[in-house]
Amino acid sequence: MSKFVAADEYIVPSFQWLLGPTSSQVESFDSSVAGWIKRYEDESKRPESTVDGSCESFVLAVKPVMIGGQCEPAYDQAKWAETCLNVTNLASGLTGVRLIPLPEMARMIYLDEEDSFVDESEVDDWYPEDTSDGFEYLSADGSDYHQNSEPEEEVLDKSNGTLESEEARHETDVKSICSFRDIPVETTMGHRYLALSEEFASIEVDYQVSSIVTPLNKGSIYMTLDVHEETHPKSGIQDKASIERLEAAGHNALKTHAYFDDSYYEGFEESADFSSDFQRLKIKQSHVDWYKDPDKFFEPVLNFGASSRRVGSQKTVLTALKKRNADVPELSDVVDATEVPICLRQSYLNIYGADCLFESFNIMAKGLDYHKRWKSHKELQGVTLLCETNLQRYQHMIKSDVKPTVTDTLHVERDVPATITFHGKGVTSCFSPFFTACFEKFSLALRESIYVPIGKISSLELKSKALNNKFFLEADLSKFDKSQGELHLEFQRLILINLGFPVPLTNWWCDFHRSILSRWTLRPGVSIPLLSKTNRGCFHLLWEHFSDNAMMAYCFDMSTAELAMFSGDDSLVICGSKPEFDPGVFQSLFNMEVKVMDPSLPYICSKFLLESEFGDVFSVPDPMREIQRLQKRKIPKDVQVLRADFDSFCDRMKFLDRLSELSLSVLCRLTALKYCKPGIEGDVRAWLSGFAYYRENFLRYSECYVTDGIHCYRRVDPMSRFKPIDKFQRSDKEWFHDWRNNEFPKKPIDKMARMFGAYKGPVNNDRVERKAKYKVNAAMHDPFALAYERRYVQELELKNDKGNCSVLRE
């Protein structure tokens, strides 16, 4: 029960009567207030008011009146009690200031009146000021001094009875005003503590220098500075990178990913029963051993990304096909297929884009030129003739490198690998050059506000494009391949014809894809019929852009977009006002699931878009994805493969040179918003510092993987010889990194080596020396050969000059 509310007036806590039915309670409050008002109608009977939070104190301080049976102003028990509490705390904190009475302060706060709490009725602007020069001024003639002045007796009579009160009042005012007008100065530890009494130790005994620690035996101090220290000081930003810090940041950001081992779930899946819902399915004996030797791949040191390497066994393939290629929903609405290509042309193509593929001869000639280029630097082995191949049969494949998840659902759900339905390279090489030529022609006809990152050097860097104060629409067609059907094949045919692609070639392409597609997977032994799939070489990318652009233009007004980016199944629309887009309409019309990110951020192709200080847009890879890519389990134990992965890592980390402190803060905030994790901004900074550290050289990058000393040169701890341990019983903890030592220990360093014999790894000093000498000789061979050739040419020129001179003499 509150100390500011009397026991007989306390009914229920404020938060209860505010939420519940309060009619009867309000009437009781009004009746109690009316009783107190009637009791103190006579001003002479009013006692001194207090601020104890009771109804009586409210009547005495606020002085309400009864109008029509209701109290004005209304009496709020909880608000009045809280007001009294605040006034009491305020008065206790301002001890050196003369304030107005507490009931008056409570009345002003309760009625929300603006006025000062300081009592200014008796405070004037007088402030004591010492203007003397150190001596008292007296006139040379005393009679002149008293000539124009009043008699001393009259002055004393005028000030009689008031002098003492004035002096007391001024003394009080000076103390109160001086407490406010002290000039703030910097304080030290000497200002904070004042020693009151102390007693030093005796110095009769000769102390050693090392033993004199605290000569003050007894003392008491008094704290004079009334300042509360911060109990939890904020730590500065640390940029030092280490494996331990990166792993700690990863465990904080991804709660369910810590030390996740997928091998248990792999064995559980292979040993459990499997139920299939396919209508038509062919299965034969599988030739895949689901348990592969993991020692053939590098083991990452970090373990929070849940990056698993899947084996394409029969049950894994069936699980992936069931998740990715089955259970396609039916259409729930009707759409005019002929309007879709018209929207594509009107929304994305410029005035010169009408019939951009109409000149079919030029398209075919360009495609033939692409084919000749491919043939000039590729062998023709494996290239087949289309007339001798059944194009209705495809191959199925699953991605063994599973894309790691970023949601906290790893403890309840296991990722399913993605599937790919494709033609072989020999088949796609026959028609991909023609569709490449179509894509080139189509990209040249796009409007300036439409951007499609294509080509060998595909970049998301844009000049003079602003992102600040913009609205974003981030849409992802995550189930693009799964949701395709007859309708999308008709979209494809109409779009190609509308753009001017040859009609006979278009009809031929679409007709044989309407048939059932079936193909045995080579090793798992699974065959399943599929309908209208588009994972077929270059045209898959072309059709993804066509369909994504056309369906977005049909459901969204692209005229409101200042900039639109499309890359496969990812799309990003930048608008000056808030975009209006209904995913339900999109799904009901096109039988395709579209996922609109909330909140929508400048994010496309797993990259964030940031605006530089000069008004340009540059892309930054997702830090969450990049830290998970440092834990890949599909890198074979080969130096060249690991170095190639390091080169790819350095190429992706080029954005670090462009990050300012402002861009770094924005990137951390965008990452936290993207994954709805407000507490990972510090973790993102730790990851970025790790990226900058490990991209410096290959030896640092090798720390992220267990390389068994192949790339991390080590030497013995020099203090180990003082320890009573046999040199043949050293453990891994007694070795530390030393990049200047180029010799790996030849003695066994762990338990397994002592059990199975001496360490015999891929590192052999003799072989390394021979290989190094061979590289040096090979590097020196070319310069020597060029030097000898140049000397031979000079000798020939000299002989030729001598012959010419002899001819001239004759």
UniProtKB/Swiss-Prot annotation:
User: What reaction does this enzyme carry out catalytically?
Assistant: RNA(n) + a ribonucleoside 5'-triphosphate = RNA(n+1) + diphosphate
State the residue spans of region: Disordered: 140-160
Q: TM segments?
A: none
User: One biological process GO term for this chain?
Assistant: DNA-templated transcription
**InterPro entries under this entry?**
BBMV_Gp1_N (IPR007610), DNA/RNA_pol_sf (IPR043502), RNA-dep_RNA_pol_alsuvir (IPR001788)
Q: Which Pfam families match?
A: BBMV_Gp1_N (PF04522), RdRP_2 (PF00978)
Molecular function terms in GO for this entry? RNA binding; RNA-directed RNA polymerase activity
Q: Which domain of life is it from?
A: Viruses
Q: Which UniProt keywords apply?
A: Nucleotidyltransferase, RNA-directed RNA polymerase, Transferase
Entry keyword Isomerase: no
Enzyme Commission number(s) of this protein: 2.7.7.48
Q: How does it assemble?
A: Interacts with replication protein 1a.
Similarity-based family: Belongs to the ssRNA positive-strand viruses RNA-directed RNA polymerase family.
Q: What does this protein do?
A: RNA-dependent RNA polymerase which replicates the viral genome composed of 3 RNA segments, RNA1, RNA2 and RNA3.
Q: What is this protein called?
A: RNA-directed RNA polymerase 2a
Q: Which organism is it from?
A: Broad bean mottle virus
